[in-house]
């Protein structure tokens, strides 16, 4: 299973430089940062900025914009994606529902995320870029299933699943049995969609073996940066070492 390293665009360390020619290190960056900068090299803007010759994904930064109260328009994200055109995968603008959202507010976020995917997909189609939709997990699975079906009916090349972290980690305000239900939802998406499935934010070594068993294609993590700051590395299958 593929594991992408989430990274700020100007941060260090950059492990892909250390493993150059030895190991492919796919990375994920956020449009939340890219919206503030301009390409340095229009021939390969992202690869030049990151000093990376391998695979790069771009997340829309929807959660970051939402958590900071910033309203980002679809046209603005389309501009960023067009300027930084050399990534292999681009995720749609999403509005993750919180476990504490009531069903009305949660469904409004699902509706907006779907509308954004449709609009952004049409805009980027002109640039030859295919956008990946995101379906979020939420405690009211009736709502989730309706929007999952709507996304599958649009026949995307890949689906990303978000909103799982609070349910997998069983934080406050999530229903009893949430971890099992969230993992069952991942399995349902894999089975019903039948295509490539990426799970957002669950690249912990203790979780990735489970995702692989469920048939997930890829996931991502930013935890490696926190551990690296303390001189640690993450070990496949769980655990860490100095």
Predicted regions and their residues:
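Residues at the C-termini of beta-strands that transition into short coil/loop
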Residues: 94, 222-223
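Non-catalytic, usually N-terminal nucleic-acid engagement modules in DNA/RNA processing proteins
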Residues: 1-127
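Glycine/Thr-rich beta-alpha phosphate-binding loop at enzyme active sites
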Residues: 101-108, 130-198, 204-209, 213-216, ...
């Amino acid at each position: 299973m593929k594991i992408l390293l989430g990274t700020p665009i100007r941060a260090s360390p950059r492990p892909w430089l250390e493993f150059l020619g030895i190991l492919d290190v796919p990375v994920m960056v956020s449009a939340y940062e890219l919206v503030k900068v301009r390409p340095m090299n229009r021939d390969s803007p992202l690869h030049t900025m990151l000093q990376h010759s391998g695979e790069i994904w771009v997340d829309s930064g929807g959660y970051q914009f939402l958590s900071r109260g910033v309203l980002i328009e679809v046209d603005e994200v389309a501009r960023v994606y067009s300027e930084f055109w050399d990534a292999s995968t681009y995720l749609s603008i999403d509005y993750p529902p919180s476990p504490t959202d009531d069903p009305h507010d949660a469904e409004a976020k699902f509706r907006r995320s779907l509308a954004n995917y449709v609009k952004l997909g049409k805009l980027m189609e002109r640039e030859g870029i295919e956008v990946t939709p995101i379906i979020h997990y939420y405690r009211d699975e009736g709502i989730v299933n309706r929007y999952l079906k709507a996304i599958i009916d649009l026949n995307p090349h890949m689906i990303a699943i978000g909103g799982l972290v609070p349910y997998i980690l069983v934080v406050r305000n999530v229903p009893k049995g949430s971890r099992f239900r969230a993992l069952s939802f991942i399995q349902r998406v894999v089975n019903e969609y039948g295509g490539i499935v990426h799970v957002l934010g669950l690249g912990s070594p203790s979780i990735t073996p489970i995702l692989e068993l469920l048939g997930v294609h890829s996931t991502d993590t930013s935890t490696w940066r926190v551990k690296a700051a303390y001189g640690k590395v993450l070990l496949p299958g769980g655990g860490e070492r100095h």
